[in-house]
Amino acid sequence: MFNLIRLELKKESFKWYGIGTVIANLLILALIIPIQYVEKIETDEMFMIMGALIRAVFIIFGAVLLSKLIIDEYKNKTIFLMYTYPIQRKKLITAKLLLIGILTFITISISSALVAVGYFIIHNMFQISPDTIPAQRLIVEIVSMLKFAIAAAGASLIPLYFGLRKQSVPATLLSSILIVTVITQSNPWFSLADNIYISLVAATIGVFIAFWTIRNVDKVDAI
């Protein structure tokens, strides 16, 4: 399985993903600092906003990966060339989905830590709000974001269903935007962005869709 994942890494160029990750992190950090300064938002809410933004960005990035590694290959029929290899179809699809889930989890985890540390340093240097952020608080917030990262990795697979059903990249991307809109919404009365149970439900749906796809890949030539 790891050999197949390594093959995918060699076959596709992920340079765009790395560059996009760096740019996204810088933009998120550049966005949250002035928001807190101008709106006088409490630190608790800022960490929630930070985590929600990071998860939203990389769930959409996950949809782009789904489009490049799976949807495009079905749409252009190039995936059927891989099915001529002496390797089970299930293993090929599993490797692709594992790669997408692992990349999404890793990038959300690293981004959460980097953006949180960046925010911590800037906040304490320039005192952009009356709140103080001790190092212990920073660690607690990062650990909390890592729990959401696991759930987001599963949720990032939900667009697979819509993309394969239509064999459409736009459907894949639009469904990912809809998903992040739902699971990261927040208002003064009720917030889904910091509700781990909602995120876990979305993750369960994503994992179920992945298993369904793997199970049915041998039965038909197009899912």
List each language-model region with its residue ranges.
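Membrane-helix interface segments
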Residues: W16-G18, Q88-R89, I93-T94, S168-L173, ...
